[in-house]
């Protein structure tokens, strides 16, 4: 079965529309205008892998508007409503890419760190890398993205705690970075933007990490060091698994009663290959949506670790892989108009007070005395970074994709373009470019054409688990100011 070779969507000029910003209400993400809860249908987006972040050559995943337009169109057709971007340069202009994803109805979750020296916490010696120069760069990331309405939130760390050994020293520093980021946002942004942590799904430290970051020191519910959201990179569902065999039932039981939104910041085991993505119906089904707020598929662009949905070539052309079609077909099995139309609960959640008894694993840090703000950093928190990056939504004159894109059978797609959605509408799986008002049901496809059906290609092998190489690499810090 071959994919249809035409995608029809509006490609002309349009005035900038904006998705509604999301807020955290208890354990849910909530649309600030409709009051509906929001489920993340996400995609990890790091074009070029680690090489895609190259400050010396003015390059990062959100700096090329034509590439963003190409990828936004393909992800919009897939049904993605959120992208996660790992490594960004605050000195580059991201207006065009942010505006394109905004028009396509997609939010952005931004990691404030990068693999370069001085741009992340060193998990081996976090006290050496927590200083004003490091914080200055994280604040600059906030400045660069705070004004985009589709900025969903920031991750203060990614898999910095991956063992009991790192759990002994790292947690207070991640919590301190969270505190500093939230105070900076409070002083310099016009809305509260969630800050959270993306954890490795290492069961020895997962529960303790969650409890360490979600609790309130001295019972103060306004504690600025408390995470606004908690996410995990999990690859425990492989192939034709089940809710029980994958251990998803254990995760639901673990996070039952969470006081902050919990979601998968990465998922998508890559064996068998091609992938089958049978976890989609569970993640967005009744067994999980009361506890989890969706998840982020790892990942859009094919890299050496073989998790991609699309081969993105150096000349700008794209070859879609079988996994793209499979994921699209799995999304079609979910009634997202119902999933996204649930009114957020108004029940007050219980926020645990930080106590040593919350920590179960012997050797994991159970001290909630945090490092003081490092010398020179408080002045930046109070007065802002300088020079100050400024981001804004801009009008896009043409949403037409100019790069050649081929499906998994080698057919060239024609008429590919981003379809700008109406104001306050986010994307949803379904017809190409159709959207939902973050919980108010499916919108109509103004072009009148249905999204293509992409046929999976090739046989499936026996399921097995494989964990990808960690996305966040942590190096000994050096001093770097923007």
What feature does the model see in each segment?
Residues 272-353, 357-367, 371-376, 380, ...:
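Substrate-binding cleft of secreted/luminal carbohydrate-active enzymes
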Residues 55-75, 134-142, 205-223, 276-283:
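Short, acidic/polar
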Residues 138-169, 196:
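Active-site groove signature of glycoside hydrolases
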Residues 65-119, 171-196:
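Aromatic-lined substrate-binding rim segments of carbohydrate-active enzymes
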Residues 449-482:
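Cleavable C-terminal sorting propeptides in eukaryotic secreted/cell-surface proteins
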Residues 166-285:
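Noncatalytic carbohydrate-binding groove/subsite architecture in carbohydrate-active enzymes
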Residues 2-3, 8-24, 28, 450, ...:
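N-terminal signal peptide
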Residues 20-104:
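Active-site-adjacent substrate/metal-binding segments within catalytic domains
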């Amino acid at each position: 079965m071959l994919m249809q070779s035409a995608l029809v969507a509006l490609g002309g000029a349009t005035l900038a529309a904006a998705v509604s910003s999301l807020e955290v209400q208890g354990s849910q993400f909530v649309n600030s205008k409709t009051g509906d809860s929001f489920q993340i249908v996400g995609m990890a987006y790091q074009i070029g892998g680690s090489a895609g972040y190259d400050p010396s050559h003015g390059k990062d995943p959100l700096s090329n508007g034509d590439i963003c337009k190409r990828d936004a169109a393909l992800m919009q057709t897939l049904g993605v409503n959120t992208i996660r971007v790992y490594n960004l340069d605050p000195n580059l202009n991201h207006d065009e890419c942010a505006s394109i994803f905004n028009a396509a109805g997609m939010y952005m979750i931004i990691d404030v760190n990068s693999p370069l020296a001085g741009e992340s916490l060193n998990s081996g010696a976090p006290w050496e890398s927590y200083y004003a120069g490091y914080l200055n760069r994280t604040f600059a990331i906030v400045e660069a993205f705070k004004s985009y309405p589709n900025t969903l939130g920031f991750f203060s760390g990614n898999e910095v705690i991956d063992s009991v050994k790192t759990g002994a020293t790292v947690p207070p520093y991640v919590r301190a970075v969270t505190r500093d980021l939230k105070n900076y946002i409070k002083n310099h942004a016009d809305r509260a933007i969630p800050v959270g942590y993306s954890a490795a799904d290492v069961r020895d430290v997962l529960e303790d990490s969650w409890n360490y970051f979600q609790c309130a020191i001295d019972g103060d519910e306004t504690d600025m060091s408390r995470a606004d959201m908690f996410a995990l990179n999990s690859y425990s569902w492989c192939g034709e698994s089940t809710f029980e065999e994958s251990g998803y039932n254990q995760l639901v039981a673990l996070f039952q009663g969470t006081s902050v939104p919990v979601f998968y910041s990465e998922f998508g085991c890559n064996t068998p290959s091609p992938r089958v993505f049978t976890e989609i119906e569970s993640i967005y089904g009744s067994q999980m949506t009361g506890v989890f707020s969706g998840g982020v598929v790892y990942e859009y662009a094919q890299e050496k670790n073989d998790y991609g949905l699309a081969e993105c070539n150096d000349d700008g052309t794209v070859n879609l892989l079988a996994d793209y079609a499979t994921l699209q077909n799995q999304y079609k099995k979910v009634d997202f108009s119902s999933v996204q139309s649930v009114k957020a609960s108004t029940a007050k959640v219980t926020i645990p007070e930080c106590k040593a008894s919350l920590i179960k694993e012997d050797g994991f840090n159970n001290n909630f005395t945090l490092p003081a703000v490092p010398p020179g950093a408080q002045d930046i928190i109070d007065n802002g970074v300088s020079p100050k990056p400024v981001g804004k939504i801009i009008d896009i004159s043409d949403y037409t994709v100019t790069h050649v894109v081929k499906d998994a059978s080698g057919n060239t797609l024609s008429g590919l373009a981003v379809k700008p959605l109406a104001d306050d509408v986010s994307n949803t799986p379904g017809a190409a470019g159709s959207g939902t008002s973050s919980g108010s049901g499916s919108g109509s496809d103004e072009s009148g054409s249905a999204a293509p059906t992409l046929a999976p290609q090739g046989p499936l092998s026996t399921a097995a688990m494989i964990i990808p190489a960690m996305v966040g690499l942590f190096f000994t810090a050096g001093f770097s100011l923007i």
